[in-house]
Amino acid sequence: MKKNLLKLISVMLCLAMILSASAVIGSAEGESETPVIGEFEPFRITVTANGDTKTQKGFCWYTVSNTDSVVKLYDANGAEVTDAEITYSDVFEWEGNFVHKAVVSALKPGTEYFYTVGGANGVSEKGSFITDDGNDKFEFIAVADIQASSDENFAKGAETVRAGLKTMPGAEFIVNLGDFTNDSTNEEWDAYARNVKDIHAKTTLVPIAGNHDGLGVWDWFNNMFSLDTSESVQVRNGVNYSFDYGNAHFAVLNTNDLLSVSIAQLKWLENDMNSTDKDWKIVFMHKSPYTLGKDGKWPDALYLQKSLTKVLDRCGVDLVMSGHDHQYLRTKPLKHNKINEDGTVYILSGTAGTKRYEIRPFLANHFLDTDFIAALTVQKRGWGNYWNGSDWEQTRQSNIGGCFNCISVDGGTLTLKSYILADKEAETDPEIITQHDELVLTKQTGQNKITFTGDNTTSEFEYYIGVVPSFLMLAVYAFGEWLPKFFIMLPALLDSVINKDIF
């Protein structure tokens, strides 16, 4: 009896020691995966395009507790810059943390600045950015749809962006075409920011709102970045804004606006594009007018294809880059929904993340004419995922990975090169980057003229007055064009669902 009691005590002590060790290890692992943020430590720090890119930047950061907002700038020699003007927004609470925003202006063009953000109780490490020098030669990177939920998948998305910076080290800003997260929660935004912290610390971000960036709570996207909202038609679930860089004019659309893009936003875009004489006109947006992705079968995609492209045609837009469908597709130049060398090229920019979608071949020649396709790459193994110019083929093995796009502008030449960072089977595997597409556009410079000089703001009254016509326009497209196309496509769709489990 006594021996059995001693054995029982020994076993219980061993179990206690094992459980204690497990708790310590588990705690340590938890801390390594989710570091504890100090009460006044700045986090989720971003520097964004905000207004005049030669002289101005937007700053946004968070703290756990309320504290003052301070941005400090330094030159390349480490001396504090005192001649910049800094305008701070009121600090406000959001989802359990406090949001700090500032706009820094009176900067010098073509200058590298270093900065810290924070307050009296906590200051960030130094970051850096460069202002536009106004010259006609510059480079930038574009990615889309990191859209992760786990720290592991955010890390993989961040590696894709780093591969972009390694491939194009002279990139002056990074465009994120939306869906930063999957469910837009505190935990996911923290994981995103934690994994791209080193990237955001040395560049300017051009963010675009994705449909996943405000799920459940609309204001998430707008509270993550300091953006120029002076002409935005609404500021709840995304922002539309524009800026110049070099000899290019960029407009950012918000496809979370009513039916993807409201009539008010279409009007804003046309006025905006007609108010510039820059050589290149480029539009960034999340959803795409031309796609073979899973959402290409719904009325809002056709609505974009019919309503938005008319504005782009009239304004002479050269390039549209989008995300949303987690695959890469480039169209030939299109105008009036036909191939035209003077038209607009549409780029569905692939996914930088790990969620990758098959194409839907049943959409072909119903919602996207296959003759329009210049390049198509799907980053996922599966049936019929590559378009070779005349037929669907199996996915190429080299295309299995995250996608990033490097764009350079040099006067009258714009070059886009798209790359895949191959997935690794093991951490020790070498990094393999493969170029899978290239676009070169050329034009004569100095040809664009300013034709609009008026006020391009939209009052709340004007916006809501346009809601009914926007829905009527969708109804016309839905019942007049989408529904007949859908029923004609239906047998192929059902075959895809039954035989390939692809909807």
Task: Specify the residue positions occupied by each region the protein language model found.
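Metal-dependent phosphoesterase/phosphodiesterase active-site architecture
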Residues: 29-70, 76-81, 89-91, 96-99, ...
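Short, conserved loop/helix-junction motifs that constitute active-site signature segments
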Residues: 168, 196-202, 338-341
